[in-house]
Amino acid sequence: MRELLTRASSFMSLLPADEQAVPEPSPNSFFYRVFYKHIDIANKVVDTSYLQTMAAGKLCPDYYGQLTVLDSYYCYRAADTLKSLLCKIDQEDNPKLYKLANVMSQKYDKYNSTFLDYWHLRESDSVTPTKTMHDYAEHEHNVMCYEDPIYTLVAYIPCYYLWPWFSQQIMERDGYNKDGIYDYWFKGNYYGKDSYKSAWLIGDLIEEWEAIEKTFDEAKAEEIYVKSMNYELQVFTEADKKEGGQ
């Protein structure tokens, strides 16, 4: 049996094998302050019927397949956005930012190169996005085009932090079906504190940038972050509403 293809196995881990020591952002960091300020959005994601039905092991496989294929559109756009971002970063002035953005881009490429074959698709253009998924990817692309590079990483925090977080919340609740068909998916997103290290890398870089550059606009960053969070909520809210599932 071939290895199951998941986000976590391909692009969610930004750490090379020999670099596992990642400090957790401080409690007063932008990373945690903005998350807990808007934790109501995260909790709404947890409570979506898609994830709750999935947790019970009863989600129609049609819906799972539809969202997985739809999510690939986001992943292909993310790879393109991050490659364009590299052109905006001065590698000598901001080596850490460049390195992280480059690793993120490479990880998306790794996932994307496997996805088409795994799901028997001819090309990435075969995927027709919903308006929400298109707008989500466009939001991150626009941030890359019109804002300083650090804000693009802010836009990607929900992608890297929310997924392990909501998986942890769901797995620790009563009613979670450990023998369900989707147990591997939740375990692929949350496997202890290591699940959060990639998001922490982004958070620590933002904290360092904020301390050194003194040009980090928290109000702007929060607006970008919340917009990404709301797109995540919309994606999961709509995920079991498309005709074709039972």
Q: What annotation goes with each model-predicted range?
A:
Residues Q66-Y76, Q106, N230-Q234, K241:
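K/E-rich alpha-helical interaction surfaces of small helical-bundle regulatory domains
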Residues P25, V69, D93-K197, V226, ...:
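Active-site-proximal alpha-helical scaffolds that flank and shape metal-associated catalytic sites
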Residues I39-K44, K58-K88, Y151-P164:
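Alpha-helical bundle segments that constitute or directly flank the non-heme di-iron/ferroxidase center
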Residues I89-N94, K214-A219:
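Structural helix-adjacent loops and short alpha-helical linkers that scaffold large soluble proteins
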Residues L14-D18, R33-L59, A78, G203-A211:
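Short alpha-helical hairpin
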Residues L4, S9-S10:
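Serine/threonine-rich intrinsically disordered cytosolic regulatory regions enriched
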Residues L15-F30, H139-E140, P149, Q234-T237, ...:
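Hydrophobic alpha-helical segments
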Residues A219-Q246:
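Acidic, carboxylate-rich catalytic segments that either coordinate divalent cations
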